[in-house]
Amino acid sequence: MSTFLISCGGTGGHLSPGIALAEGLQARGHSVRLLISHKKVDARLIAKYPRLDFTRVPGTGFSLHPVRLARFIGTQSRGLWFCRGLVRAARPAGVVAFGGFTSAGVVLAARWRGVPVALHEANRVPGRAIRVLSRFANRVYLPPGVRLASAPPGAVRPMGLPVRQEIRRVSQTDARARFGFAVGQKLLVVFGGSQGATVLNDWVRREMPALAAEGVQVCCVTGLGKGSDETVELRTHAGQPVRIQFLTFCDCVPELLSAADLVLSRAGAGTIAELVRCETPAILVPFPQAADDHQRANAAFFERQGGGVVVEQTMMHSVRAEVLDVIFDEELLRKFRGNLQRMDRANSLELMLNDLEEMTRTHGASGSPGTATAVVT
C-alpha cells in the first residue's frame, strides 16, 4: 500500500485530527509517520500512541516582533531543509497538512518532488498557513459553506474534522466514577483547549464557592504550566459536600466530556468537534485574540446549529448566571443534545480517507509499501 505524510502538530487542534487520520490510514493498510513540533502539548498527547511513528520537525510560530520573526524565518528554513530530506527518503504517495507553523516545509518539499498535497482547515476562517499554501494543493478540505479564493479550481472539498476513534460518548455514571464525581449533582467541565485559558481558570477560582453552593461540581482543566493538580471540597447551602477539581492536563477526553452536564470552553474547531461527538452541550467563550478571529466564527456556527450558547469574554461577569440557567434546565439540555446528535451524522474521517485514496490514484503517485507516515507538525 501507500505511504502518507501528515503535518499536524503545534496544538491539540492540529494534532488530534492528524492522529485520527493516521489511525484510519493504518487501518486501511497504508503506512503512516507523524511529524510533530517540539512543544510540550505534542509530547504529552503522543504518549498515548506508541504504535504511531512521530518525528519532530523544526518550527516556531509567526510573529511580527523582530526577534521572534528572525527566529521564525530561521526555523522555517531549517524545517524546509529537513522536510526535503524526509520526502526524498519516504517517497510518499501523498502529503496532508492541517495548518500551523510546521506545514510549509513538508508541503513545499512535496510539491518540488511532484507529490500530491491535501490541506485541511478545521476553522470557519482559514488560517494563514492554509491561505498561503492552498495554491500548491491538489485538495483543500474546508468546513461546509466556507470558501477560499486562493485554492485552485476544483480543489476544494467540504469536510468536517476527523475525530480520533476513542472520542465517543460513554456512560455518564462510569465516567463520573473515573474522576470521583457524584452522580446526584450537576457537573460543569471547564477547559481552554490544549493550551489552557487563564481567563477561564481565574473564573473558576472566583466563582467556585457560588457554584458549589448551588450544588454544581466543577472539573477545570487548566492547561500545562497553568497551575497544579488539586481537589477542593466545598459545601452546598444545605451543607452537602461538592467536589471541585483542577487538572493541568487530561488525556481522557471522552470520559471527561461524557461526565459533564455542561462544558464551558474556548471555541477551537477541535474542541467543538469533540463536543459534538460526545453530545455535550456547551457555553463557548471565543478567544478574542485568535488569528483572524476564527474562534468567534466557530462559536457562532455552533450556536446557530443549536449545540449551546456563546458568551463574549467581555461578559465573563454574566457567565455564572448563564451556567446556572442552562445546567438546571433539563429540557434545554435535551434539546442541545439532540442538535449535537444531528450535527454528528457525517463521518468526516471515512469521507476524507476515501478522497485521499482517490487523489493519490488520480495523480498516479506510488509510495513504498509499509507503514503509514503521519507528519505531526
From Swiss-Prot:
Q: Specify whether Protein transport is a keyword of the entry.
A: no
The record's comment on protein family reads:
Belongs to the glycosyltransferase 28 family. MurG subfamily.
Query: Principal place where this protein is found?
Result: membrane
The UniProt record lists the EC number as 2.4.1.227
Catalytic activity reported: di-trans,octa-cis-undecaprenyl diphospho-N-acetyl-alpha-D-muramoyl-L-alanyl-D-glutamyl-meso-2,6-diaminopimeloyl-D-alanyl-D-alanine + UDP-N-acetyl-alpha-D-glucosamine = di-trans,octa-cis-undecaprenyl diphospho-[N-acetyl-alpha-D-glucosaminyl-(1->4)]-N-acetyl-alpha-D-muramoyl-L-alanyl-D-glutamyl-meso-2,6-diaminopimeloyl-D-alanyl-D-alanine + UDP + H(+)
Name its GO BP terms in alphabetical order: carbohydrate metabolic process; cell division; cell wall organization; lipid glycosylation; peptidoglycan biosynthetic process; regulation of cell shape
CDD domains, alphabetized: GT28_MurG (cd03785)
Described by its record, this protein's role is as follows: Cell wall formation. Catalyzes the transfer of a GlcNAc subunit on undecaprenyl-pyrophosphoryl-MurNAc-pentapeptide (lipid intermediate I) to form undecaprenyl-pyrophosphoryl-MurNAc-(pentapeptide)GlcNAc (lipid intermediate II).
Mind giving the lineage of the organism this protein is from? Bacteria, Pseudomonadati, Verrucomicrobiota, Opitutia, Opitutales
Q: Where does UDP-N-acetyl-alpha-D-glucosamine bind?
A: T11, G12, G13, N123, R164, S194, Q295
What GO cellular-component annotations does this UniProt entry give?
Answer: plasma membrane
Gene Ontology molecular-function annotations: UDP-N-acetyl-D-glucosamine:N-acetylmuramoyl-L-alanyl-D-glutamyl-meso-2,6-diaminopimelyl-D-alanyl-D-alanine-diphosphoundecaprenol 4-beta-N-acetylglucosaminlytransferase activity; undecaprenyldiphospho-muramoylpentapeptide beta-N-acetylglucosaminyltransferase activity
The pathway where this protein functions is: Cell wall biogenesis; peptidoglycan biosynthesis
Swiss-Prot/TrEMBL keywords: Cell cycle, Cell division, Cell inner membrane, Cell membrane, Cell shape, Cell wall biogenesis/degradation, Glycosyltransferase, Membrane, Peptidoglycan synthesis, Transferase
Q: Could you tell me which species this protein originates from?
A: Opitutus terrae (strain DSM 11246 / JCM 15787 / PB90-1)
Query: Can you say where in the cell this protein is located?
Result: Cell inner membrane
HAMAP family tied to this protein: MurG
What does the record say about its membrane topology?
Answer: Peripheral membrane protein
What name does this protein carry? UDP-N-acetylglucosamine--N-acetylmuramyl-(pentapeptide) pyrophosphoryl-undecaprenol N-acetylglucosamine transferase
